[in-house]
From Swiss-Prot:
Function summary: Capsid protein self-assembles to form rod-shaped virions about 18 nm in diameter with a central canal enclosing the viral genomic RNA.
Protein name from the UniProt record: Capsid protein
Coiled coil: none
Record-level GO cellular component terms: helical viral capsid
Organism, scientific name: Cucumber green mottle mosaic virus (strain watermelon W)
Length: 161
């Protein structure tokens, strides 16, 4: 039993890029209260978000029969997901100073602005992700997955001699 036909352009569909929709939405809604002002808050959020995707389908393992899954490598969700991860990846870039032991007032103010910008960007991308998923972009069940990627599940056949 396997999916057919498989071409290089379809291999991304079989990657560990799926999250159950309810799990992802619950995580995103709960994350709206996250303290993105601290590096620890951004790190914790990014690590938790990065741990959500998993592999639910393989060339030899059929897409789950029940439930809806967000495909984070899809054409709509991928740029939002990557932007969200990037907005939380500010370690060692928030404060860029000439003399690290004695930052100037301007350098400190710039660091605060960068932190605020990262927080604003993260919150905006969380909202964008929730909205896109709610509209059904890159969200699949078995039938829509097989139709979207033009693959057919072929049952094993036995030959009679």
């Amino acid at each position: 039993m396997a999916y057919n036909p498989i071409t290089p352009s379809k291999l991304i569909a079989f990657s560990a890029s799926y999250v159950p929709v309810r799990t992802l939405l619950n995580f995103l809604v709960a994350s709206q209260g996250t303290a993105f002002q601290t590096q620890a808050g951004r790190d914790s959020f990014r690590e938790s978000l990065s741990a959500l995707p998993s592999s639910v389908v393989d060339i030899n393992s059929r897409f789950p029969d029940a439930g809806f899954y967000a495909f984070l490598n899809g054409p709509v969700l991928r740029p939002i997901f990557v932007s969200l991860l990037s907005s939380t990846d500010t370690r060692n870039r928030v404060i860029e100073v000439v003399d690290p032991s004695n930052p100037t007032t301007a350098e400190s103010l710039n660091a605060v602005k960068r932190t605020d910008d990262a927080s604003t960007a993260a919150r905006a991308e969380i909202d964008n992700l929730i909205e896109s998923i709610s509209k059904g972009f890159d969200v699949y069940d078995r039938a829509s997955f097989e139709a979207a990627f033009s693959v057919v599940w072929s049952e094993a056949t036995t030959s009679k001699a």
